[in-house]
């Protein structure tokens, strides 16, 4: 779907030329099929194979082990930046759009072109676009809130008949999201009043029986990171007048100052033998607070579609990498902001302050996860009690009942008591490795 959207974009009269750089990250057969599809769509395509990536790995600050078929974000972005810069400069491109492969190009391509033109004319260096649909966070950090929604919905459904109408979700959910940013996020620091506020799942069905059937059929997608019950609404506002300084970069970024792709490394601290997550944010902080570039966020929206993603095989690993990466970014950004724009090395006291804050923030966020884990375990127990008896199969059919039991079994496995103990030991071990200090010393 992303390639189809890019092909649509090339038909816009405002697009002179589009160069597509594809980074191999996955099975060789799958990558070959993607490249072939891009060329079928007549997209000017530059394919970057694993061999190509290995050729520049050390020069880019990576080790050969980073260049695998399942790369960490820091490695993927570092390589993407390098090859995109080479193509953009050789082909005379004046803007780079860096996207994750699961986002979708907006249908209104004329408005997209107009917005990019306006952002470029505003003399911005980097624009961090917004994401709607499923959030760009580990699946394990959006389970608890969705279980709250599922439990409330099923508790209400069991009191109704199969043909009873379903409550509309639009106005109710709009109240809960108004003025909130992280209403979908189990580890939210600010919008904690939405953690236990049930949202009404956005379902197509209009009767209770059909709605329950539809919802239950989607529950396993929560483990793949889909926002089944709390999708992110598209950001509202004007891309220029509502732009604001930010370093919270994700999978939708416009870069107008192309030299930043070579000058600023997109690396992250290495813990447990691999880079942690949030390297994009560290990159944005360096661009803004070391080099003084204009880095902003704007309601330049794309939808993230995780419907083709598989359930995460090791959700705790990705979650811990995210907690540690965010903690380091937040600490690093805080110290850089406090000292003012400067590209000089951190003083000894500043370096120690980063390390102190990073450990503090990591422990705070893991504490939030601890609460979330045990709350999810309790919600799983409540869900099991809610669906006892035959009401679910009577209301939505035997298949729905079987799907629900499968989902409950998966919850029991993911939120077993011993699982959290293993996760806590992994977190403590990674935090004690000294990778934060090593990164600052590079």
Language model feature labels by segment:
Residues 2-17, 27-28, 41, 121:
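Short, acidic, metal-binding catalytic loop of nucleotide-sugar glycosyltransferases
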Residues 106-267:
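Conserved catalytic core of nucleotide-sugar-dependent glycosyltransferases
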